[in-house]
A protein has these predicted regions:
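Short secondary-structure junction/hinge motifs that connect adjacent elements
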Residues: 29-39, 54-65
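An N-terminal low-complexity regulatory-tail signal and nearby short nucleic-acid-interaction modules
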Residues: 56-111
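Catalytic center-proximal scaffold of phosphoryl-transfer enzymes
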Residues: 1-49, 90-481
């Protein structure tokens, strides 16, 4: 052994000895690797439990005065290395409220049965695969949990994301506080679109069968990298809700974290022509916003008018060359000659005329939103048979958009996990304690201005009679007569 005094060296030597004993009975590296990981995780889980107990003992020995010992409780947390079991000391403060020094020091959420690392793993995994598969991935070399536990982790993460996004929107649009940003760009590209997914419990005739996830993305142009064109520094945001929530939260929380909102001068906004897709300008009042009709939607609409795609591409070439009005006239002529499908052609003609000022404008290349909806949200939420609740779909969309933006999905804190009932019980105990103290304080009654100190004045240079009258009057005022 190289160094007997180094804990890391001793641990490595102990593992090497255990792995050697395993290797002597194995015929393949695959079996050895699997057993080595399982053995290592079991040892790590047990060692982590012992370390937590040692830290608890240290904190208890240095606890604040006034805490009295109540009991020692067993605790088990599911983690990425298996179940971590340990004992935790519980104390009571002067108000009769429970105090856990270890949980307070390590910010362990109330009532949780999952470690923060395992919860983070489940949220990340469930954003790619089903809840059942995410649970199996954790159980491969860690703790076993139910799919319902994975769903609870997603719900919690989605709720925390929504709270942060809403707080960012209020801070910007109500309080006028511009968020701190990572970079500065004078010109941005933005795109917005909606995508639909199946709704749970839509068997009733009057129940909606589909829900819409509204999504937006902002990026600082495109660049060639590795033989492909990539968008630069994307900021994503998506939810199930109103356009107002999408834009206010998306601009304040997602875009505002990436780009300094006060420095943005021009925005190229792409969309399919829906009214809500054009609304970004309302939330970026200092920027000049130019709306571009998404070329993908133009191509898709014109191609749907013809059985022969060659005719469609002839019209699209005219559009791309700048002849928007000429292309519409050509499509009308094809309709009159019976070369185009009547129903589709009439709809597309109306669509193109209604957006004629936003077709084939000068500016950077856009047209990425349709593929984004498929590759970010559709690949998880619509790629295999499943249906979503409104809240579940919104939570998933928020989490996926955060992941793709490189932003951290918030975890549950001890303070945030208290809940209204726990908070109310604690406040009740504290109030009862202070009420029983009696005479510990006196609230001075006043009207309008809160507490006012007794009236005083310098009477040393006043005549005795006048000084007496002034002091008497002030005393009467102090007594409230």
């Amino acid at each position: 052994m190289a160094n007997d005094t180094n804990p890391k060296a001793r641990a490595i030597a102990a593992f090497a000895e255990m792995f050697f004993e395993k290797a002597r009975t194995k015929t393949s590296l695959s079996d050895l690797e699997r057993e080595a990981i399982d053995l290592g995780h079991r040892c790590m889980a047990e060692a982590l439990g012992l370390a937590l107990e040692a830290l608890d003992a240290h904190l208890s020995a240095n606890r604040p005065k006034g805490l009295r010992s109540h009991d020692i409780r067993p605790r088990t947390l599911a983690s990425e290395v298996g179940d971590v079991s340990f004992s935790i000391r519980r104390y009571r403060d002067e108000c009769g409220c429970d105090v856990y020094p270890l949980a307070d020091a390590l910010d362990i959420a109330y009532g949780t049965r999952i470690s923060p690392g395992a919860a983070e793993f489940l949220v990340e995994a469930a954003a790619h695969v089903s809840y059942a598969k995410a649970a199996r991935l954790l159980a491969r070399h860690g703790s076993s949990v139910r799919p319902q536990t994975v769903m609870a982790c997603m719900r919690q993460a989605g709720r925390l994301c929504a709270e942060q996004d809403e707080a960012a929107a209020l801070s910007l649009y109500r309080d006028g506080v511009v968020p701190e940003a990572e970079s500065v760009e004078k010109e941005l590209c933005m795109e917005a679109d909606g995508t639909y997914f199946s709704v749970q419990g839509a068997a009733a005739d009057d129940a909606p069968k589909r829900l819409e996830v509204k999504a937006m993305v902002a990026y600082a142009g495109k660049e060639a990298r590795g033989g492909k064109v990539h968008r630069k520094r994307c900021a994503h945001h998506a939810l199930v809700g109103t356009p107002e929530r999408l834009w206010s939260e998306g601009v304040a929380s997602a875009v505002g974290r990436k780009y300094d909102l006060s420095k943005i001068e021009r925005v190229h906004l792409g969309g399919d022509g829906e009214r809500w897709c054009r609304d970004a300008g309302r939330y970026l009042p200092k920027a000049e916003v130019a709306f571009h009709l998404d070329p993908w939607h133009v191509n898709h609409a014109v191609l749907a008018c013809f059985a022969d795609s060659k005719l469609a591409w002839n019209i699209l070439e005219v559009i791309n060359d700048g002849g928007k009005e000429e292309a519409v006239a050509l499509l009308e002529a094809c309709l009159d000659e019976g070369l185009a499908r009547e129903k589709q052609a009439r709809s597309v003609i109306s669509y193109l005329k209604g957006n004629i000022d936003h077709i084939a404008l000068d500016g950077p290349s856009l047209g990425t939103m349709e593929s984004e909806n498929q590759h970010l949200y559709g690949v998880r939420m619509d790629s295999f048979p499943c249906a979503w609740s409104v809240r579940g779909a919104s939570d998933m969309a928020r989490i996926i958009s955060r992941r793709e933006s490189g932003a951290q999905v918030p975890g549950c804190t001890r303070e945030g996990s208290k809940g209204e009932r726990r908070r109310g019980r604690r406040e009740g105990k504290e109030l009862s304690f202070y009420e029983k103290q009696g005479g510990s304080g006196k609230v001075v009654k006043s009207i309008g201005s809160g507490y006012l100190p007794p009236h005083q004045a310098d009477t040393r240079k006043m005549a005795p009679g006048k000084a007496y009258a002034l002091r008497k009057g002030m005393a009467i005022m102090d007594r409230g007569i």
